[in-house]
């Protein structure tokens, strides 16, 4: 079996590592992520994983290349009633940025969403200045449907 192939597989507790936590605390990696607003620890990620692995409305995949965990792709807010979900993703290992891995990983996740879950619509959110993410989405057939100006979020 070839080791140098890109794999997407469901995340397991054993995938949790100090590298993963380091990625989440790296301001460059999380520049466009809501994860950037808090400090992450192994404990906080164990709690996060516990919730994700129990969830009926989310599928969290690890991105692996040469058996190295590079990042994650999540199909979240899955609605079988409305046949849609959101896709979220990140590559934590910066050495693998700009190599097409993000685009290929999203493609694999879309295959699961459309062919296994039988969803009809997948959506993603990205910042207008996150050109790399927009490029990855466009490569996978996404179109801009709208722009949220003056977006505010209530923080309790």
Regions inferred by a protein language model and the residue ranges of each:
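Conserved GNAT-fold acetyl-CoA-binding loop/helix
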Residues: 29-49
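Short Gly/aromatic-enriched secondary-structure transition segments
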Residues: 22-24
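Acyl-donor (CoA/ACP) binding surface of acyl/acetyltransferases
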Residues: 1-16, 26, 60, 64-156
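Short loop/turn motifs at secondary-structure junctions and domain boundaries
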Residues: 51-57, 142
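Short, P/G- and charge-enriched loop/turn segments at secondary-structure junctions
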Residues: 48-51, 75
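Hydrophobic pocket/interface hotspot
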Residues: 19-20, 29, 45, 87
């Amino acid at each position: 079996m070839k080791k140098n192939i890109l794999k997407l597989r469901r995340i397991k507790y054993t995938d949790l590592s100090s590298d993963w936590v380091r990625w989440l605390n790296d301001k460059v990696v999380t520049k466009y992520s809501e994860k950037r607003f808090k400090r992450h620890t192994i404990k906080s990620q164990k709690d996060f994983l516990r919730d994700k692995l129990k969830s009926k409305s989310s599928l969290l995949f690890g991105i692996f290349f040469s058996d190295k965990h590079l990042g994650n792709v999540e199909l979240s807010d899955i609605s079988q009633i409305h046949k849609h979900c959101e896709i979220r993703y990140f590559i934590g290992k910066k050495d693998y940025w700009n190599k097409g891995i993000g685009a290929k990983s999203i493609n694999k996740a879309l295959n699961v969403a459309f062919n296994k879950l039988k969803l009809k619509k997948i959506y993603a959110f990205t910042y207008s200045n996150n050109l790399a993410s927009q490029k990855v989405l466009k490569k996978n057939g996404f179109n801009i449907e709208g722009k949220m100006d003056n977006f505010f979020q209530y923080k309790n």
